[in-house]
Amino acid sequence: MKNLLLFTLFIFTLFSCEKDQNLPAPYYSIEGKWLIEGMIPDGNTMYLYEDGLRYTYYCVEGDCEALYNSYEANDGNHIPGPLNYTYENDILTVDLNFGNELVTPITFECDGGEAIFETPGYSLFRLNSGCN
């Protein structure tokens, strides 16, 4: 009787488990601090996307990473005039002013640490992601 009960429990457990083959794709946000790779000194431009505004920061010497880590949105260290942006359905739209816009599909790699801009064809790397 005990063996029958264990066998029944085993069969019930075996057939009640479903394989979840269709896991949803991870969602990555553009919000945060992003560096342009290949600038001299390396990473001398940082974009900070937050609450629909893109702030631009520059670093010309010293420890740029430590400097960028200390910056916060609208802290006065950015260049004047943050730009408006939207990010919906994997499409980034940045209002570059004077009728100009950057509209590009974005794909993410490196667990969200690299944002690949389809047009104009470059990548941004999330600050402190180690993806460069």
Where are the regions that the model predicts?
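Structural signal for glycine-centered tight turns and loop->strand junctions in beta-sheet-rich domains
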Residues: 52-54
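Short, low-complexity, Pro/Ser/Thr/Gly-rich segments in the mature regions of secreted, periplasmic
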Residues: 121-132
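Contiguous, well-ordered beta-strand patches that form the walls/edges
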Residues: 39-41, 58-121
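Bacterial Sec-dependent N-terminal signal peptides
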Residues: 14-34, 132
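Sec-dependent bacterial lipoprotein signal peptides
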Residues: 1-16
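Tryptophan-anchored aromatic micro-motifs
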Residues: 26-45, 83
